[in-house]
């Protein structure tokens, strides 16, 4: 007779088979797994119930942690809709635009349109919900490749977006408008449905972002077909510079986010001290901050490091081949010291006149390599693991913000460094440089430390002192980052950093 351990192992083997088939396991009852295995996995924390009869894969001990749900969220929506509604469903035009624009925040409510809709709201985990609305959908929908979601085609989504969307989600709306190469697809939707009111709104939207050619084409073509088109601008403001056509939504999104946030940072931040004349004196002050900075920066990320351990690795009394080989905290502390020295070198270049954005663009791969080199020394990581940005998806524990997918990271990072290079205000470079770095999350691990290094390199470019984010303010600091990521409000994060700058 099998032991309990053997039975548990058999159930886990069934779960493993499912995980080999799907990136994220979403189960409807016993359709894909036997009742006994389902119950055993659920009772032992390897599955969590989303709603009656629906489950997602989890890990024991993660009960109450939102990360599993946010990680599984869109996969669940796609599978639930496919099972319940077949192929005749899609997200609303507004939520389709969210996804086209690269918005990665998990919404409080998803609204699906389908002829089979029942107009009822289904409560899901952690105060999220799903409304399946009875409605006709576009003749053809776009199958989004990441999660398998059905979306409005981009042009049709722009035409049928609610007027309010252009005011509440102006970054997403403008990002999607900039993805349209010419007026043809928009006009096909408008002329097919005789949508003269919508034509006036979408023409005004294109004119708002500076695309006069598409705006004029929409108006003239619709009027040529006899429609009374009265152009109106659905936005409440104008972008500072015209937007150009971009295949990648992340390029436009990041530029618009920067434009939207920078003035608030300038308003809240103390005036920059200015150029540092005594470069060596400034670098000595950076050296004096090392121990304090290492303790707090590593503690923020959950590592157990003592002042004694930090001093041990600083003076070189660290022997990875001996007693510290399995001591992860020691490896991390040593890596932090090596990375800190690399950042110090970058700051030296900046203080001697190198453009701060160009300096960090060139040197941040070296910071990252030094941060993890001790793990290569002891054989935990390979050298190739430290080259380039991540190739897999990463999630932030407890956050509604889902970092960019690996392909998007490669689109986004050059934009970040261009923004840093061309930004005239050092406080904006510091606050937004840090925030955008962790928003993108270009590495599998160490993004918080890297973001704080970016912060201090940019602070140095304005003559501000090296600034430590204390672990005692971790909750406030993380909450402010979350608000900026999810709501687009940078004010709390700017206030936190401004209050720490001395």
Please annotate each region the language model reported:
Residues 1-36, 42-50, 58, 62-502:
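FIC/Doc superfamily catalytic core
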């Amino acid at each position: 007779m099998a032991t309990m351990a053997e039975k548990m192992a058999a159930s886990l083997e069934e779960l493993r088979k499912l995980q080999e088939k799907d990136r994220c396991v979403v189960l409807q009852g016993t359709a894909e797994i036997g009742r006994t295995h389902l119950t055993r996995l659920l009772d032992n924390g390897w599955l969590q119930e989303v709603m009656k009869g629906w489950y997602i894969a989890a890990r024991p001990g993660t009960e109450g942690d939102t990360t599993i749900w946010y990680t599984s969220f869109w996969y669940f929506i796609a599978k639930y809709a496919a099972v319940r509604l077949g192929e005749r469903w899609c997200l609303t035009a507004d939520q389709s635009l969210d996804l086209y624009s690269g918005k990665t925040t998990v919404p409080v409510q998803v609204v699906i349109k389908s002829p089979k809709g029942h107009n009822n709201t289904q409560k899901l985990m952690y105060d999220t919900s799903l409304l399946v609305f009875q409605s006709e959908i576009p003749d053809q929908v776009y199958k989004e490749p990441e999660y398998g979601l059905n979306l409005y085609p981009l042009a049709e989504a722009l035409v049928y977006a609610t007027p309010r969307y252009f005011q509440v989600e102006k970054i997403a709306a403008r990002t999607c408008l900039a993805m349209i190469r010419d007026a043809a697809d928009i006009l096909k939707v408008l002329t097919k449905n005789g949508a003269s009111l919508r034509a006036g709104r979408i023409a005004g939207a294109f004119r708002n972002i500076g695309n006069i050619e598409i705006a004029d084409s929409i108006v003239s073509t619709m009027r040529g077909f006899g429609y009374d088109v009265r152009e109106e601008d659905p936005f409440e403001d104008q972008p500072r510079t015209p937007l150009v056509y971009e295949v990648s939504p992340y390029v436009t999104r990041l530029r618009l986010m920067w434009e939207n946030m920078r003035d608030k940072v300038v308003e809240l931040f103390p005036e920059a001290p200015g150029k540092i004349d005594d470069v060596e004196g400034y670098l000595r002050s950076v050296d004096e901050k090392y121990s304090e900075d290492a303790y707090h920066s590593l503690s923020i990320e959950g590592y157990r490091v003592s002042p004694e351990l930090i001093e041990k690795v600083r003076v070189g009394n660290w022997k990875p081949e001996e007693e510290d080989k399995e001591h992860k905290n020691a490896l991390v502390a040593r890596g932090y010291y090596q990375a800190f020295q690399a950042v110090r070198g970058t700051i030296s270049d900046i203080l001697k006149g190198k453009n701060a954005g160009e300096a960090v663009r060139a040197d941040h791969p070296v910071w990252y390599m030094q941060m993890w080199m001790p793990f290569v020394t002891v054989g935990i990581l390979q050298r190739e693991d430290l080259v380039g940005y991540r190739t897999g998806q990463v999630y932030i524990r407890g956050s509604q913000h889902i970092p960019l997918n690996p392909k998007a990271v490669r689109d986004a990072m050059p934009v970040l460094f261009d923004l840093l290079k061309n930004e005239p205000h050092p406080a904006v470079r510091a606050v937004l440089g840090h925030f955008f770095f962790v928003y993108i999350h270009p590495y599998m691990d160490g993004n918080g430390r890297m973001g704080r290094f970016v912060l201090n390199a940019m602070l140095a470019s304005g003559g501000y002192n090296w600034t430590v984010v204390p672990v005692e303010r971790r909750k406030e600091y993380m909450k402010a980052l979350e608000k900026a990521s999810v709501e687009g409000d940078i004010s709390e994060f700017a206030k936190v950093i401004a209050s720490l700058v001395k």
